[in-house]
A protein has these predicted regions:
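Conserved P-loop NTPase
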Residues: 739-790
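Conserved lysine of the Walker
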Residues: 448
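Extended, folded cores of ATP/NTP-driven motor/assembly subunits in large transport
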Residues: 1-403
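Hydrophobic positions on the alpha1 helix immediately C-terminal to the Walker A/P-loop
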Residues: 451
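Hydrophobic anchor at the beta1->P-loop junction of P-loop NTPases
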Residues: 440
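P-loop NTPase motor domains
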Residues: 53, 60-79, 86, 90, ...
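Post-Walker A helix-loop "phosphate-sensing" segment adjacent to the P-loop in P-loop NTPases
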Residues: 458-469, 488
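Conserved AAA+ ATPase "SRH/arginine-finger" region at the nucleotide-binding site
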Residues: 491-496, 718-727
Length: 791
């Protein structure tokens, strides 16, 4: 128990005297370490959060599925539980957002200054966006007998969790400190400061409510002065029979200080039917009496209101007799807060107008604002009882579905643009997903390269200790590494390039699936030689290669990997093959001759690149198709060795492969397609060892034609879809199961916009930047602008 134990019952036996302080107004009395709150005489509450859904972006059939699943949730509510949904608009914390988005270190000169200006513009834009939603559920329970146990709340929570899981909404129980923070935000709507409890609270003799409560409460007829803010509690008096599922979202999808609380109590089916039968008897009795009275006067007419009510009751009786229909007592409360009385009146007018649009009547709670406020708070207690309730059947109660749009903010994430629906910043951490690997898909001119370069810049600024590697077939990314730009190294690879990579670079301590490092390296070298050969190796050829690889590493092994002078090279293997007695060995050496003593010897000697740089771009524009088939595999092997080395140091490695479709069409025209297969292997390995890999392509149809590439797309948790051409759009929509409303974001043709698919989330985004400044100048691929710059 967090509060010291008291004899609470005496308070209730006195009928709960009027609170003497602001702290006394907060409607809980004890809270326990397991998260349960005592909120009334023998009444206990468990509180948990649930995740919003992008309900409005779902397909029509998906919305219907969610609506039906929500009905099942309501139908499953125990009749001894008071169920409450609490949805509060929570202001964007600009300082927190700024802290998350701004660079961790001041570096890169003018780039840093311009980047910070871009971030600040987006922070200000987000401040005006739709507020994020705090979404809670409170389950309130009062034991009726001595054998009843309040721990049944946890059982009910687990049962509800299965329903929310089916709707793809994550739920988790709130611990007391989390609830306190939410209460503090409700009571201090315009403070916009983080709630913190001192670690020595009890040593000071303090009380938790001292840190939650506002400075004062002043309950007026139709509003409450809460500290320096003005709050008004209203309730829904009447619903339209044809109410649609957008009502709640239209109330809440803004940046006003609005909270909606919905209390639902399921009525026992037998009790409900008995009440309806009794109502029918009463109405039938009234009709019979009117007929008798009218007969005496020479007429036989009956008022329409009675016949209509009887028909409604008979329809209700018939529907309630069905297996999927329940009766609920529903109360809906709306809390509005503003900084001045005039602003409160304006906000009230706005909300009533929104409600009128849906034929919903909203009334004030006159001289009951205190009870109303305590009813709004997430403790599962309706302090106004049935006085403001409406009885609804399952389908009508479920139309008040709580889902609308998600907001996306991760403290550890990077900025992925502005949400095109909510206008708020999208901050995502790809590494939080089950599979952080991803793809960026967009035709030429869609803003693909600019998006990727901005993501690279975001990583460089946000994660200064991480390492970045780009495989660049079109000579696009070298501009990022220039004087006064980002610090890194461009490695140009071509037949005559001075840049060297040693195919034998190895970490002897590494093992995988029961294989030691040399066995794994031997398999890789077989793959390279097979690609160079143009068709599959025979088993005797593999044996010869494996033998020579092990001989080549012998002296390096004896030094336990410490003597780098003894590290073999492709030249070592070439010479060993020439020394073997088998004629096949001479043929294998002949295959390698082109790459050792011939025109393509970039991979014959020891690695000579500056390995201290944390940003490397492999420029393969001039590599040529003949060298590319082997070269891509060797580059990927080098990347893989870097990933292993970085993991030991606690460094994350980010890899971007532009036009990754070349991996599946490497120019070898061989039946082996080894580059694609090896890319699939390295791509999956990187994720398992703390890396983040991204494939980029404009040739989506070519990629989908490859089973391996298609499988990679399906399994990746992170995909960026930029505006698509019509012939690609249909295939993409089918592959990613996009709804028509989601598909519309890919039809706009607006550069730098589209959809981000991150796990279960599909987010419409806009990551355009203004066409000026150092950042834009560094990342722009606009040829006309380039011409103007050099002329």
């Amino acid at each position: 128990m967090i509060f010291s134990k008291k004899k609470i019952s005496s308070l209730f036996s006195k009928g709960m005297v009027i609170p003497k302080t602001a702290q006394d107004t907060i409607p809980f009395y004890e809270v326990y370490e397991n998260g349960i709150f005592l909120v009334g005489e023998d009444r206990y509450t468990l509180i948990f959060s649930f995740e919003n859904l992008d309900y409005s972006l779902l397909r029509e059939n998906e919305q219907m599925d969610t609506y039906q699943d929500y009905q099942k949730l309501l139908n499953a509510l125990p009749t001894d539980i008071q169920y409450q949904e609490f949805i509060m608009n929570s202001s964007i914390n600009a300082d927190k957002l700024r802290k998350s988005m701004m660079p961790k270190e001041r570096r890169y000169g003018e780039l840093y200054d311009d980047y910070c200006e871009i971030i600040e513009e987006n922070v200000k834009r987000s401040e005006l966006a739709c507020a994020k939603k705090i979404m809670l559920i409170a389950l309130s329970y009062k034991p009726q007998t001595k054998v009843d146990n309040i721990n049944v709340l946890f059982k009910y929570f687990r049962e509800m969790q299965t329903y929310f899981d089916k709707m793809k909404s994550d739920v988790h129980q709130l611990m007391p400190e989390e609830v306190f923070a939410i209460l503090h935000e409700y009571y201090h709507p315009f403070d916009n400061i983080e709630f913190l409890l001192p670690s020595d609270l009890y040593a000071r003799g303090g009380k938790i409510k001292d840190y939650i409560a506002p400075s004062s409460f002043a309950f007026k007829g139709k509003e409450v002065e809460v500290g320096t803010a003005f709050t008004r509690i209203m309730y829904v008096h009447r619903y339209d029979r044809e109410l649609d599922d957008t009502f709640l979202s239209e109330l809440l999808d803004n940046n006003f200080k609005i909270t909606v609380s919905k209390h639902i109590l399921r009525i026992d089916k037998g009790e409900a039917l008995e009440k309806v039968r009794q109502e029918i008897f009463d109405v039938q009795g009234k009709i019979q009496k009117r007929m008798e009275d009218n007969h005496k006067k020479g007429g036989n007419f009956v008022p329409f209101r009675l016949t209509d009510k009887l028909k409604e009751l008979e329809d209700l009786q018939e529907r309630l007799s069905g297996s999927n229909i329940e009766l609920f007592e529903v109360s809906l409360f709306i809390s509005l807060s503003a900084e001045t009385k005039d602003e409160l009146e304006e906000l009230t007018k706005h909300i009533k107008t929104k409600a009128s649009k849906h034929q919903v009547t909203i009334n004030y709670l006159t001289r009951q604002q205190d009870k109303g406020m305590n009813t709004v708070l997430p403790f599962g207690v309706n302090h106004l009882g049935s006085a403001v309730s409406t009885y609804l059947l399952t389908d009508a109660a479920a139309i008040l579905i709580p889902f609308s749009y998600r907001t996306y903010f991760s403290d550890s994430g990077i900025f992925y643009g502005i949400n095109k629906v909510t206008n708020s910043a999208i901050i995502l951490d790809r590494t939080e997903e089950m599979n952080s690997n991803g793809f960026v898909l967009g035709p030429s001119g869609s803003g693909k390269s600019v998006f990727v370069k901005l993501e690279i810049a975001d990583v460089l600024f946000k994660y200064p200790n991480d390492e970045i590697i780009v495989i660049d077939p079109d000579n696009e990314y070298g501009a990022l590494i220039q004087k006064e730009n980002f610090d890194g190294e461009v490695l140009k690879l071509s037949p005559n390039s001075p840049t060297k990579f040693n195919i034998f670079d190895i970490d002897l301590s590494y093992s995988e699936e029961g294989k030691d490092a040399i066995s794994i390296k031997s398999e890789f070298i077989m793959t390279v030689i097979e690609t160079a050969k143009g068709y599959k190796l025979e088993s005797n050829e593999k044996s010869i290669i494996d033998r020579c690889v092990r001989i080549a590493y012998h002296d390096f092994q004896l030094s336990e990997g410490r003597d780098t002078d003894k590290l073999p090279t492709l030249t070592t293997l070439y010479n060993l093959l020439r020394e073997q007695p088998e004629p096949e060995a001479i043929q294998l050496a002949l295959i390698l001759e082109l790459y050792v003593t011939g025109s393509f010897r970039s991979f014959a000697d020891k690695t000579n690149i500056n390995i201290s740089k944390k940003f490397l771009v492999f420029d393969i524009f001039d590599m040529g198709e003949q060298l590319r088939a082997v070269g891509l595999q060797i580059i990927l092997e080098y990347v893989w060795q870097r990933v292993i080395e970085n993991k030991k140091k606690g460094i994350r490695t980010w890899l971007w492969v532009d036009e990754f479709s070349i991996m599946f069409n490497d120019g070898s025209n061989s039946e082996t397609s080894q580059s694609g297969k090896f890319f699939v292997k390295v791509y999956s390995r990187i994720r398992k060892h703390g890396g983040v890999a991204t494939g980029i392509t404009q040739n989506i149809i070519d990629v989908l034609a490859s089973p391996e590439a298609r499988s990679m797309l399906n399994n990746a948790e992170f995909k960026v879809l930029l505006p698509q051409k019509s012939d690609n759009l249909k295939e993409i929509s089918r592959l990613f199961e996009l709804s028509p409303s989601q598909e519309a974001f890919l039809k706009s043709g607006e550069k730098g916009t589209g959809l981000i698919i991150c796990g279960k989330k599909i987010i419409p985004f806009d990551k355009k930047i203004a066409p000026h400044g150092k950042v834009y100048e560094t990342i722009s691929t606009n040829f006309k602008e380039y011409q103007q710059k050099i002329n």
